[in-house]
């Protein structure tokens, strides 16, 4: 493969909100997660002879930090996005399945670093036989979230170490649709 060199600086605005959630499944198992969105990123990435420049007006990182003791079997969906739209930094965070039935969610939208929590579950609908087909992500009871996610890349990682088995599908793509804020914006 080609040589990869990266020198990136991730800026973390001190006034930005973060999403922090503890999900207690029972007395023995829990998960804490912290999500920091739309972190302006600058620098360069070089792959072989190609050089890519990142500027903080168009390039963002996300910090996803978690700790906990998970149940033996778990399934979850996570979707996120960071971008600039109409001059504002917009971040999306949606989680599903792993929080179902707990009364808590990791669903939120960030606008210029200010988080608006979405307290309702979202439903991820997709073809488990073809993760590259478009997905829908919708709020369970309202019209707050109504998105289509269209993947253009899939990374698959499978592990079978007898006691531990996992299958991860990471898809990268584009969102299209609507997320309605409480203030109707």
Pin down the residues of each PLM region.
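Structured soluble/peripheral alpha/beta segments that form catalytic or ligand/cofactor-binding pockets
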Residues: 1-185
């Amino acid at each position: 493969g080609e040589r990869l060199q990266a020198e990136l600086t991730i800026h973390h605005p001190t006034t930005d909100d973060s999403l922090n959630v503890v999900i207690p499944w029972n007395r023995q198992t829990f998960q804490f997660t912290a999500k920091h969105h739309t972190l302006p990123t600058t620098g360069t990435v070089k792959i072989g002879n190609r050089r890519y420049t990142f500027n903080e007006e168009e390039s963002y990182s996300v910090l996803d930090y978690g700790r906990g003791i998970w149940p033996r079997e778990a399934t979850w969906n996570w979707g996120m996005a960071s971008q600039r739209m109409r001059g504002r930094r917009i971040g999306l965070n949606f989680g599903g399945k792993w929080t179902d039935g707990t009364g808590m969610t990791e669903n939120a939208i960030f606008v210029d670093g200010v988080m608006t929590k979405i307290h309702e579950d979202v439903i991820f609908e997709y073809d488990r036989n073809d993760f590259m087909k478009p997905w829908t992500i919708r709020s369970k009871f309202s019209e707050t979230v109504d998105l289509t996610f269209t993947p253009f890349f899939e990374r698959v990682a499978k592990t079978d170490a007898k006691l531990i088995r996992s299958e991860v599908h990471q898809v990268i793509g584009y969102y299209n649709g609507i997320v309605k804020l409480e203030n109707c914006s």
